């Protein structure tokens, strides 16, 4: 994320077309995944045969998995990715973002329902959930991540938590972040 951010990409408001401040922070989840995946491929940091975005689920092809790594149809990894951006580009709280992480309702396509979807999807390889987001002094990610882990444990078995920090981002609001991931197992 840091190397993509260093190029100062500019996202635009979906409704007005107005540009946001430079940086990876204001980009949509899909755009961020695309930008970071392309950067990892360019740098050679993906040490596998390949990857593909938006891969149909084996058992429900109308649903798409955010990222599959390896060679299809027997992917090494199927990964659902969710963004946790608690503040908007304007510095105001994003009031409904926790729904995208914690909602138990499939219609919300949350991180929580992504776990159960992955566990029952029919992928032959391993499955994982990745949550990336931005840290703010008054809105740290840890309480939301811990809440996710507690809720997810009701539906699936989570592997060990992996995480890394993202620092010195160029956006004036989305200045730093964290990336979390867990391997997902059916209960």
Q: Where do the language-model regions lie?
A:
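A short acidic, glycine-rich active-site loop
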Residues: 98-113
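Amphipathic coiled-coil/heptad-repeat helices and related helical stalk/stem segments
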Residues: 61-63, 111-114
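Nucleic-acid nuclease catalytic cores
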Residues: 119-147
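Non-catalytic C-terminal interaction segments of nucleic acid-processing enzymes
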Residues: 136-187
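Interdomain/boundary linker segments immediately adjacent to catalytic/signaling cores
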Residues: 1-42
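Surface-exposed alpha-helical segments enriched in charged/polar residues
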Residues: 38, 116-120
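A short acidic/basic microdomain associated with nuclease active sites
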Residues: 40-68
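Conserved catalytic cores of phosphodiester-cleaving nucleases, focusing on short active-site segments
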Residues: 67-69, 73-99, 118
